[in-house]
Design a protein with these regions (language model features):
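Intramembrane alpha-helical segments
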Residues: 2-100
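C-terminal membrane-associated helical module and adjoining short loops/tails
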Residues: 24, 59-222
Length: 222
């Protein structure tokens, strides 16, 4: 019942946003919102326990990014790397999370970690291309090297936990790696936003950590 309520609530918010977008004349947003709502329902009621589950969940994350970007008039050219990269990352996290019950196998954990690393590389490549194209105001001030260092630190913190889970594939280690990878989604999003939109919008994204941390008191993120 709680899962059903959460699904109805999330789809309801998506629908409300889609209606607002239609009223404003943004039909592309409606199409993306419909795709996102469908992906959420497909994952929870059909794909969650199947081999396609990680792909569908990754698609949900990619469409989530795409929804916001479409509402802002994008994506254009290299901006497609953002939903692609974070979608790949979340697909890897979902695949890794499937191994958390009992003693896990190293091969699936290793493959999942490689998928996560690939997603992080794709997302980071967007910023490299952005800088090559003239960059944003923030990149002009801070420099690409500083952003890449920040991204590398965050990516390493995620992947290190995952590697620890591979080295000792016990339930507790895998669960900690998954929890860290999920919580890092918000931080990674914020750093990507920082590169293109600056500190103000990055801070707005980081504030999403507050409800996330509070919700962990009620239920495990995994």
């Amino acid at each position: 019942m709680n899962v059903l309520l959460a699904d109805v609530t999330s789809v309801g918010w998506i629908a409300a946003g889609a209606v607002a977008a239609v009223l404003a004349g943004h039909w592309q947003v409606l199409a993306v919102a419909a795709g996102l709502a469908a992906a959420v329902w497909i994952y929870d009621f059909a794909a969650k326990s199947t081999p396609a589950g990680p792909l569908v969940m990754g698609g949900c994350r990619g469409l989530n990014w795409l929804l916001g970007m479409t509402a802002a008039g994008g994506p254009q050219a290299a901006e497609w790397l953002l939903p692609a990269g974070m979608g790949i990352y979340v697909a890897g996290v979902t695949f890794y999370a499937r191994q958390e019950a009992g003693r896990s196998r190293r091969l699936p954990l290793g493959l999942a970690t490689a998928v996560m690393a690939a997603g992080l590389a794709v997302g980071g490549w967007f910023v490299v291309l952005l800088a090559a194209d003239g960059g944003s105001d923030w990149l002009s001030r801070a420099g690409l090297d500083n952003w890449l260092l920040l991204w590398a630190v965050l990516a390493s913190s995620v992947l290190f936990r995952c590697i620890m889970g591979i080295a000792t594939p016990e339930s507790g280690n895998v669960q900690r790696a998954v929890g860290n990878a999920i919580m890092s989604i918000i931080t990674l999003d914020a750093v990507l936003v920082l590169s293109a939109c600056g500190e103000r919008w990055a801070i707005a994204v980081l504030l999403l950590l507050v409800p996330f941390v509070l919700s962990r008191r009620l239920a495990s993120p995994t």
